[in-house]
Amino acid sequence: KNAGLNPVIIDVKCFALKSAVDQSNQLTNRPDDANLTAVLEFGLDENYLMILYDNNPIITDIFIRGQDRKILLDSQDAEEKEGLVRRYVTQVKQAIQDFETKYEKRIRNIKVVSDINKIEEYLGSFRKSLLNVGFNTFDPTEGLKIPSQFQQTLDSKNDRSFLSTAVGLAFRKLDVFG
């Protein structure tokens, strides 16, 4: 409203993210992502592992404590960060094991979406804790044609995962006029 816009669509963030991932998988045409993609939302507000299997989302919440949010925001203490990573990865590992046991499919890579500034630092710790799983930030713009006036701004961003919700909403096939 402050920007002079009237919202028309209210959506659930994880489904907008699913839409962005589906679109990315379609554009990049990677056979390994065709019917099994794991996406981790790692942030201050939302934390969950979403496994997209045969176009169905399987979502597992990842819980973090209030003090863990403070650690994510501004802690420089390596021991605090290690504790947070240990608690977090334990939950991610359990969600992966539950899926792999039920569906007999292996998860090798996880696309990460995050609003955390030092995401690469945390991904390095995740990789050390779960050796058989790759963690990479999700780039929802991969495969998209970006207008030249925006390309330079986009190129300056190491982590483009923050655009996932916006890209996902743009690709949602919703009939807003009913």
Predicted regions and their residues:
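Hydrophobic/aromatic-enriched cytosolic interaction surfaces used to assemble or bind macromolecules
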Residues: 1-178
